Amino acid sequence: SKKKEDFEKVRKLNTKDFFYMPGTILHLDSDNEYIDKCNEYYKSQNVKAYLYQYNESEFKDNVSKLIMKHNPKVLVITGHDAYYKKSKNNEKYKNSKYYIETVKEARKIKSNYNDLIIIAGACQSDFISLIKSGATFASSPKHINIHALDPAIIASIVALTDINNEIDLEETLNKTKYGSDGIGGIKTKGTMISVYPRKE
């Protein structure tokens, strides 16, 4: 049938006939040095990223306007944190509460997990609470330190994976310094759009 012939034609389209639009990344960080490192990494991966430096306590008040401004497909919220195992009050984490409230704020605007992939947390952050608050990827399951580039590595993989393809969680986490001990996540798809025909 003609419909079947058309389908076969589309299926056989050569990848060079397409052009690709990776998902845009919005990256909030409390550390200027980390921002510079991550910016270099994003450039090396050819992904579009907007990076902003704020103190962790300022993330929540700025995330909404930045999402509205840049309409990202991937949001990174990171900086510094610490886990106090023997804390005498309920504050077991230095900055996790700021990451959690920022994730919640972002989800008010983009509640659909496919519309915005959120990578949140820093060294020793409250993994379970971050996932429960709406993060797609978070640190740190084993309360260990993570490498400064780890969130950027995951963000780039998500940005460069086709929107119809599922992210290989195990493979992705294994590309970070400490694997699933440092960062965990939920099943999700990529954010890259393939456009046909390619315009010369």
Label for each model-derived stretch:
Residues N39-Y50:
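Short helix-loop-beta junction
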Residues S1-F18:
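Extreme N-terminal leader/targeting regions
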Residues I67-H80, A135:
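Proline-aspartate-enriched helix->loop->beta-strand connector
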Residues Y83-T102:
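A short, glycine/acidic-enriched catalytic loop
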Residues L51-E58:
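Short beta->alpha junction loops
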Residues N145-E200:
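C-terminal functional extensions of proteins
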Residues G23-N32:
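Conserved acidic segment of CheY-like receiver
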Residues Y98-I146:
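Catalytic cores of nucleophile-dependent amide-cleaving enzymes
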